């Protein structure tokens, strides 16, 4: 089975000693399915993981990502800026790419020159110049981004800031009048600036180029056909900082949701705008918790708070939120 999958994914079937990645494109009557294949050698043989990307579900629009109304207004204001870096952070599989593609769709206009550098290109978009990284041919994130800056782009999307070179070029692009969108692996929004400094970017460059950070997670949505309302225990409510007597819903399972109690997913978000106060904290080398305190004081909702709002609204369960967020 693994050999057949590797053939379909254009992966070297004779190589079983190192990890490999590939791609399978399946066209059906109604949609195009993109399968990402990852192999990993173990002591018992190769482990194969398939990740399904449905091209038809890529452009869901900002209003369908799970952003609260006030958060959508904030995001619209952020991406309307002419220059600066906007980072989307979170672990693998947290919906970062979907958020970036939704933002690109919002920004896409015939007169706007948008160029992306991706590895891999997950979804093809009309009217946007997308570049596939090919390290074997020498086309790295850094090399592609360096060339992009000579193409007079208005907006630039870099799939991921992986190294110092890419980070330096992203900062340079932002400081020379481009809006740069990218992703980073951090646990929360305030940690993004610290991560850039740790990578080797000078604090004054981070503070002057970073526009905003959006941290996110995905939670499963409760099936509205079978969810069951209950009152949150007082101790739990006290621990979470929500009013006593608050109600939430728990999953039950039915035919509609195939017995899981859940149907669909929604994002929860932590949006930090980098204003003058936070810029000064970055310049001073402040710790992440200090930056977080200032951001909260200025109105930022943490991932936990955003998740609890969805719990109280009946969108997801308390267990889902506690599983993906920290207090």
Regions found by a protein language model. Name each.
Residues 1-327:
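Short, flexible helix-loop junctions that flank or precede catalytic/ligand sites
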């Amino acid at each position: 089975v693994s050999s057949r999958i590797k053939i379909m994914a254009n992966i070297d079937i004779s190589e079983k000693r190192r990890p490999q990645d590939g791609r399978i494109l399946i066209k059906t009557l109604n949609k195009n399915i993109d399968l990402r294949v990852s192999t990993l050698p173990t002591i018992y043989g190769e482990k194969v993981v398939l990740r399904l990307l449905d091209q038809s579900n890529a452009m869901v629009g900002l209003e369908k990502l799970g952003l609260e109304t006030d958060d959508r207004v904030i995001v619209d204001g952020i991406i309307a800026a002419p220059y600066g870096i906007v980072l989307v952070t979170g672990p693998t599989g947290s919906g970062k790419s979907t958020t970036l593609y939704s933002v690109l769709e919002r920004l896409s206009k015939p007169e706007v020159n948008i160029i992306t550098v991706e590895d891999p290109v997950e979804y093809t978009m009309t009217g946007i110049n997308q570049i596939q990284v090919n390290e074997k041919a020498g086309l790295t994130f850094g090399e592609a981004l360096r060339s992009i800056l000579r193409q007079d782009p208005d907006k630039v999307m870099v799939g991921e800031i992986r190294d110092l070179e890419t980070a330096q070029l992203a900062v340079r692009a932002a400081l020379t009048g481009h809006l740069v969108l990218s992703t980073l692996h951090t646990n929360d929004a305030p940690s993004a600036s610290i991560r850039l400094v740790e990578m080797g970017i000078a604090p004054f460059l981070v503070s002057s180029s970073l526009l905003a950070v959006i941290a996110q997670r995905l939670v499963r949505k409760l099936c509205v056909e079978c969810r069951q309302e209950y009152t949150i225990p007082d101790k739990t409510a006290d621990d979470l900082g929500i009013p006593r007597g608050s109600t939430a819903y728990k999953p039950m399972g039915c035919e509609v949701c195939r017995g899981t109690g859940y149907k669909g997913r929604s994002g929860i978000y932590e949006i930090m705008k980098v204003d003058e106060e936070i810029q000064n904290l970055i310049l001073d080398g402040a710790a992440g918790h200090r930056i977080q305190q200032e951001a909260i004081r200025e109105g930022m909702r943490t991932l936990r708070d955003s998740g609890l709002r969805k719990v109280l609204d009946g969108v997801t369960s308390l267990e889902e939120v506690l599983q993906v967020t920290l207090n």
